[in-house]
Amino acid sequence: MARHPQLRLVKALLLLGLNPVSASLQDQHCESLSLASNISGLQCNASVDLIGTCWPRSPAGQLVVRPCPAFFYGVRYNTTNNGYRECLANGSWAARVNYSECQEILNEEKKSKVHYHVAVIINYLGHCISLVALLVAFVLFLRLRSIRCLRNIIHWNLISAFILRNATWFVVQLTMSPEVHQSNVGWCRLVTAAYNYFHVTNFFWMFGEGCYLHTAIVLTYSTDRLRKWMFICIGWGVPFPIIVAWAIGKLYYDNEKCWFGKRPGVYTDYIYQGPMILVLLINFIFLFNIVRILMTKLRASTTSETIQYRKAVKATLVLLPLLGITYMLFFVNPGEDEVSRVVFIYFNSFLESFQGFFVSVFYCFLNSEVRSAIRKRWHRWQDKHSIRARVARAMSIPTSPTRVSFHSIKQSTAV
């Protein structure tokens, strides 16, 4: 074997996936790159290693830096990192080349897939928890008739809008396969339109919350003048023509992929996104005025109605940024940095999926009227069952002495 070193090199190159002919061409190319360099003294000659990296002619004692190979042995590598090789003091190259920084792009793709799958799990978990919490809140508002004022009816409708949005989200996730996207069938476009409609209703019912508080606190109108049908028109009615206009625009200008996403240069999605941003900004203005009034005029007031207004404002102050932040995140570019993209994906997935949970907590579970009504129901149920127990015991008391006396009489008769 020692007589055939060239044969060993050919076998090594073939094992590494390199053609011996191409290797000789690489040597010639590497030599040509080194011709322009003017180096005096002891030096290492231009050389191509077994991986195929060209190490140009370099002075002795220098650590030479070269980009990682773009492709080796069927695997792509990140060329932004470097490999290192030392030109020894005796004018020969070090046998070992440091490729420790060279990372497989395949690994980076695997990491991206892992983050994507985790984000999907967060989305499913958040929407499940939100849907359960929203359904519980819906049932509470349905059963507790004693608290049915206009303010709580608005809360109830907001919760209903979130339930329908979460439900259509699950329909989208379970039915929209890549094949369905490509086919662009009619039913999948209807599902997308329904999801976007309920998405818009979320914002318009939040707008209804802001309108109610602004009218009651800032404009100091009596809430008795406000009618339920006004808010139903705002929350359920106004979004409908907006989505119809969007659907017509999609049908004529972007009729593909079940109306999800958008083509470059086509702005039909702004037909419904624009009104959402507008009502969001108006709500911020409403809240600014409401907080200003509460901080000045109503600070000293301790009436129960004012306390309820304050609690409603606190809930809206928390929920509105949650709704707004998640929506505005779609317009933010997370950048090319991996950490930024991962934080963006997880943060957006969490807020997007847990919105319904936060709505049910702040507008129902922490609502003092709801909690008070539940306590009354619970005490009434306890009293009812305790009365039944007392009545049952009272009815059983007379029978016991009768049996005893009859038994004693029977015994005395027998004697």
From Swiss-Prot:
Residues 280-290 are annotated as: Important for antagonist binding. The modification Phosphoserine is found at S301. Expressed abundantly in the pituitary, cerebral cortex, hippocampus, amygdala and cerebellum. C-terminal Ser or Thr residues may be phosphorylated. Phosphorylation at Ser-301 by PKA prevents maximal coupling to Gq-protein, and thereby negatively regulates downstream signaling. GO terms for biological process: adenylate cyclase-activating G protein-coupled receptor signaling pathway; cell surface receptor signaling pathway; cellular response to corticotropin-releasing hormone stimulus; corticotropin secretion; regulation of corticosterone secretion. G-protein coupled receptor for CRH (corticotropin-releasing factor) and UCN (urocortin). Has high affinity for CRH and UCN. Ligand binding causes a conformation change that triggers signaling via guanine nucleotide-binding proteins (G proteins) and down-stream effectors, such as adenylate cyclase. Promotes the activation of adenylate cyclase, leading to increased intracellular cAMP levels. Inhibits the activity of the calcium channel CACNA1H. Required for normal embryonic development of the adrenal gland and for normal hormonal responses to stress. Belongs to the G-protein coupled receptor 2 family. The transmembrane domain is composed of seven transmembrane helices that are arranged in V-shape. Transmembrane helix 7 assumes a sharply kinked structure. This is Corticotropin-releasing factor receptor 1. It comes from Macaca mulatta. The lineage of its organism: Eukaryota, Metazoa, Chordata, Craniata, Vertebrata. The gene is CRHR1.
